[in-house]
Amino acid sequence: MKTAIFTVVLALAVFAVLSFGWEANEKALSEEFTELIHEKGAASETEARECRYFWGECHDHMPCCDWLVCRYKWPITYNICVWNRTFPEK
């Protein structure tokens, strides 16, 4: 009986140590991922948007992208950019 209790307590201690190690590794990966996202985000922020994207609000002074067209869609009370059934050329 004492051996069984000792084995269970020892197993719980091993699991606690292993889970602490996994948690530390997961936190390091999370920080690395966050840094990578911030680097990529800073690079994309430098690009200026010259047109409105899909479902963006549009007017004469805010044009849609080339493959979109500005349309009034009910029940939305303003014009939005919708697909004009063409594909952008790259």
Curated annotation (Swiss-Prot):
SUPFAM superfamilies reported in the protein's UniProt record: omega toxin-like
UniProt-listed InterPro entries: Huwentoxin-1
UniProt keyword Transmembrane, yes or no: no
Location of the protein in the cell: Secreted
Description of its domains: The presence of a 'disulfide through disulfide knot' structurally defines this protein as a knottin.
Family, similarity comment: Belongs to the neurotoxin 10 (Hwtx-1) family. 13 (Hntx-13) subfamily.
Protein name in UniProt: U7-theraphotoxin-Hhn1a 8
Organism: Cyriopagopus hainanus
Lineage: Eukaryota, Metazoa, Ecdysozoa, Arthropoda, Chelicerata
